[in-house]
């Protein structure tokens, strides 16, 4: 799981929410450990100022699945990256497609509210 750039490990729900809200972009998402269910992960997605959380778990055979909206057929994936790719498409049982990954390695101090990285060493001067 550590190889997945959007996996933040054992961060609190509140910390995850702050990271997502800081982007200000609907469709921003990250993965974190569940605080209430050991061995389960949470896929957290920002939409209209709210954070929607979907439980992601691995079966005994190693397949990955996510709890989605009621009535949506549960799908299984060989790799967590395949699950994320599938949920980047519309109508997959989550509130909005995954669009903007919030990566653990992203330097928070250089991440603007637009979600676009700004290089603090680059300055443009008007003529």
From Swiss-Prot:
Top-level lineage group: Eukaryota
InterPro entries xrefs: SH2, SH2_dom_sf, SH2_prot_1A, SH2D1A_SH2
Chain segments carrying region Interaction with FYN SH3 domain: 67-92
CDD domains (alphabetical): SH2_SAP1a (cd10400)
Keywords: Acetylation, Adaptive immunity, Cytoplasm, Immunity, Innate immunity, SH2 domain
Subcellular locations according to the entry: Cytoplasm
GO cellular component terms attached to this protein's record: cytoplasm
One BP annotation, GO: regulation of immune response
Domain SH2 positions: 6-102
Comp. bias (Basic and acidic residues): 116-127
Region (Disordered): 104-127
N6-acetyllysine: residues carrying this PTM: 89
Assembly and oligomerization: Interacts with CD84, CD244, LY9, SLAMF1 and FYN. Interacts with NTRK1, NTRK2 and NTRK3.
Entry function: Cytoplasmic adapter regulating receptors of the signaling lymphocytic activation molecule (SLAM) family such as SLAMF1, CD244, LY9, CD84, SLAMF6 and SLAMF7. In SLAM signaling seems to cooperate with SH2D1B/EAT-2. Initially it has been proposed that association with SLAMF1 prevents SLAMF1 binding to inhibitory effectors including INPP5D/SHIP1 and PTPN11/SHP-2. However, by simultaneous interactions, recruits FYN which subsequently phosphorylates and activates SLAMF1. Positively regulates CD244/2B4- and CD84-mediated natural killer (NK) cell functions.
Stated name of the protein: SH2 domain-containing protein 1A
Organism in which the protein naturally occurs: Saguinus oedipus (Cotton-top tamarin)
Gene (name only): SH2D1A
